[in-house]
């Protein structure tokens, strides 16, 4: 028998580890390619393994999704609250993170790997038998792609700058029912499909569409009102060659596609794209000469006539957000002029707490969350698509460098559909992943980016939690790191993730988020 050497990890204090945990979470946000920015609620557990040249941290982080897309490349503290009338959502998560801090002059932090689980708790918080408003978190977002396409067409008709954009991924759909209205709030990412533009600046965007229907409406093809706002983000390269550290900033576009210069420049925190093949994601020394400040996006405001009309309106330049409002004409008559300036169709959604979160999906085969699925224990043996017991994934993670089935790094987005020569069956030969129609896993490779990065990290979206349920823990196994130790030994080596919590953890929840604490496991093994 072979004796595998292992050194005991040192429990450490969650409170003193928080600054490093914040940096690690920021790296996770910068690495991801879909979903919403995580903000740190608390450090739930912390261990370390120190050596002369580096210290490896093993962290458990309780997080909450913000309303900002990861495409914005913002720090979560720079994610301004949504000041519109649309509801916000409560989506919580927990991440198990391994990160290494090096003892160099920059105290460089490297993100080695992470696994996260997320779930919406909005319905559990807001829906009661006496509530006049009901919130539903729509798990299957794909049926709303057509609605997103139509909303984007409205937007494109008002601005030539967006003419070559197409819907990339429907991220989040929420239904709010109350009174005489049913509103659907649809968030989706978009991609610039102009080849001449894409090869110079791979531009992506993020849109929010509010679709309003009569409460009895069964046809979701033609909403009575549409409001849409979009932002565009450009991935431009700045920095030294050795570090390959382009900054990821926004490009403000006017209605003619030109940059807007009417707004003062405001510095933003920003991050780096994932490292190239074979590297981990890390911070590093600042760019030589600093980085030019980023200006906020120009998002003019306008109102839109019904689908099918040719009339357009100028964008008033004194506004800083794009809201295109669409109202179909009553029975064959076009409306005579736009609605009152700034008026939301039928007012805000009915009063009450809105639901929060991205469309949860069942986790695929792969390193699933720890423990049982959120809605009761699985039947005897491994469930077909739910999270198997901790430490026993049915197929294990995909081979190193290969994303799970259907989530490849290949440039197969709305602009370039997969060829017949390389379909899902070809990807499946390289890696075991979720079967078709179960796109539960969102890793950094998911999404249609033309970059070929080494895949690390996973985010599993689980079904919404109900009252009395707690968030299943993420998988604690990182076999890729342990395997890599034997071929590329590190000092200190990566150890198995600790199974016993530190006595000096967890942190207390901030009072602002105290209502979320009941959805996290209250105790850890000690």
UniProtKB/Swiss-Prot annotation:
Q: Where in the cell is it found?
A: Secreted
- Give the originating organism: Oryctolagus cuniculus (Rabbit)
Quote the Pfam families the UniProt record gives.
Answer: Cystatin
Q: What does this protein do?
A: Plasma glycoprotein that binds a number of ligands such as heme, heparin, heparan sulfate, thrombospondin, plasminogen, and divalent metal ions. Inhibits rosette formation. Acts as an adapter protein and implicated in regulating many processes such as immune complex and pathogen clearance, cell adhesion, angiogenesis, coagulation and fibrinolysis. Mediates clearance of necrotic cells through enhancing the phagocytosis of necrotic cells in a heparan sulfate-dependent pathway. This process can be regulated by the presence of certain HRG ligands such as heparin and zinc ions.
Q: Give GO BP annotations, semicolon-separated.
A: defense response to fungus; fibrinolysis; negative regulation of angiogenesis; negative regulation of blood vessel endothelial cell migration; negative regulation of cell adhesion; negative regulation of cell adhesion mediated by integrin; negative regulation of cell growth; negative regulation of cell population proliferation
Q: What glycosylation sites does the entry record?
A: 115, 192, 240, 310, 485
Span of domain Cystatin: 9-126, 127-243
Give the free-text PTM comment from the record. Answer: N-glycosylated. Proteolytic cleavage produces several HRG fragments which are mostly disulfide-linked and, therefore, not released. On platelet activation, may release a 33 kDa antiangiogenic peptide which encompasses the HRR.
Which regions are flagged for Basic residues bias?
260-269, 328-346, 438-449
Q: InterPro entries per the record?
A: Cystatin_dom, Cystatin_sf, Kininogen_Fetuin_HRG
Among PANTHER family, the record links this protein to:
FETUIN (PTHR13814), HISTIDINE-RICH GLYCOPROTEIN (PTHR13814:SF3)
Q: Which CDD domains match?
A: CY
Q: How does it assemble?
A: Interacts with THBS1 (via the TSP type I repeats); the interaction blocks the antiangiogenic effect of THBS1 with CD36. Interacts with THBS2; the interaction blocks the antiangiogenic effect of THBS2 with CD36. Interacts with HPSE; the interaction is enhanced at acidic pH, partially inhibits binding of HPSE to cell surface receptors and modulates its enzymatic activity. Interacts (via the HRR domain) with TMP1; the interaction partially mediates the antiangiogenic properties of HRG. Interacts with kappa and lambda light chains of IgG molecules.
Q: Which GO terms describe its cellular component?
A: blood microparticle
Q: What is known of its domains?
A: The His-rich (HRR) region contains approximately 12 tandem internal repeats of the 5-residue G[H/P][H/P]PH consensus sequence. HRR binds heparan sulfate and possesses antiangiogenic, antibacterial and antifungal properties through binding Candida cells, and preferentially lysing the ergosterol-containing liposomes at low pH. The tandem repeats also bind divalent metal ions and heme. The cystatin domains can also bind heparan sulfate. Binding is enhanced in the presence of zinc ions.
User: Which gene name belongs to this protein?
Assistant: HRG
Protein name per Swiss-Prot or TrEMBL: Histidine-rich glycoprotein
State one molecular function term (GO).
Answer: zinc ion binding
Leader peptide range in chain numbering: 1-8
Write the record's keywords in alphabetical order, separated by commas.
Answer: Blood coagulation, Copper, Disulfide bond, Fibrinolysis, Glycoprotein, Hemostasis, Heparin-binding, Repeat, Secreted, Signal, Zinc
The taxonomy runs:
Eukaryota, Metazoa, Chordata, Craniata, Vertebrata
């Amino acid at each position: 028998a072979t004796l595998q050497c292992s050194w005991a990890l040192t429990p450490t204090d969650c409170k003193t580890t928080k600054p490093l945990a914040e940096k690690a979470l920021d790296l996770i946000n910068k690495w991801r390619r879909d979903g919403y920015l995580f903000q740190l609620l608390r450090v739930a557990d912390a261990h370390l393994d120190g050596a002369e040249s580096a210290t490896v941290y093993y962290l458990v982080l309780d997080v909450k999704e913000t309303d900002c897309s990861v495409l914005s490349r913002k720090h979560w503290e720079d994610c301004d609250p949504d000041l519109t009338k649309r509801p916000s959502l409560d989506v919580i998560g927990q991440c198990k993170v391994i990160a290494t801090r090096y003892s160099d002059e920059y105290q460089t932090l490297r993100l080695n790997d992470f696994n996260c689980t997320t779930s919406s708790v909005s319905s559990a918080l807001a829906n009661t038998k006496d509530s006049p408003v009901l919130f539903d978190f729509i798990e299957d977002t794909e049926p709303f792609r057509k609605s997103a396409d139509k909303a984007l067409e409205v937007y494109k008709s008002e601005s030539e700058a967006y003419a070559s954009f197409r819907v990339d991924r429907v991220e989040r759909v929420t239904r709010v029912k109350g009174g005489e209205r049913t509103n659907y709030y649809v968030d989706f990412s978009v991609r610039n499909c102009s080849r001449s533009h894409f090869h110079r600046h791979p531009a992506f965007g993020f849109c929010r569409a509010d679709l309003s229907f009569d409460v009895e409406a069964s046809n979701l093809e033609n909403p009575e009102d549409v409001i849409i706002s979009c932002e565009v983000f450009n991935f431009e390269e700045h920095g030294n060659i050795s570090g390959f550290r382009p900054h990821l900033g926004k490009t403000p576009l006017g209605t003619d596609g030109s940059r807007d210069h009417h707004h003062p420049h405001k510095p933003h925190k920003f991050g780096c794209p994932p490292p190239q093949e074979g590297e981990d994601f890390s911070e590093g020394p600042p760019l030589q000469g600093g980085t030019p400040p980023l200006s906020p996006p120009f998002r003019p405001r306008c109102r839109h006539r019904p689908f099918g009309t040719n009339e357009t309106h100028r964008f008033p330049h004194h506004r800083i957000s794009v809201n295109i409002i669409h109202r179909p004409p009553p029975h064959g008559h076009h409306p005579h002029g736009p609605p009152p300036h700034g008026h939301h169709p039928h007012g805000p959604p009915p009063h009450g707490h809105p639901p929060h979160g991205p469309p949860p999906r069942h986790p695929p085969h792969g390193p699933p969350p720890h423990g049982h699925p959120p809605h009761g224990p699985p039947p005897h043996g491994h469930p077909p698509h739910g999270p198997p017991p901790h430490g026993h994934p049915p197929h294990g993670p995909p081979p190193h460098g290969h994303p799970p089935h259907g989530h490849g790094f290949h440039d197969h987005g709305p602009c370039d559909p997969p060829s017949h020569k390389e379909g899902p069956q070809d990807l499946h030969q390289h890696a075991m992943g979720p079967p078709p129609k179960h796109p539960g896993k969102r890793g950094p490779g998911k999404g249609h980016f033309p970059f070929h990065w080494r895949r690390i990290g996973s985010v599993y979206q689980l079904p919404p939690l109900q009252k009395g349920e707690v968030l299943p823990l993420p998988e604690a196994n990182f076999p890729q790191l342990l395997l890599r130790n034997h071929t590329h030994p590190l000092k200190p080596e990566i150890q198995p993730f600790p199974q016993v919590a530190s006595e000096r953890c967890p942190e207390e929840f901030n009072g602002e988020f105290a209502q979320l604490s009941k959805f996290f496991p209250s105790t850890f093994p000690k």
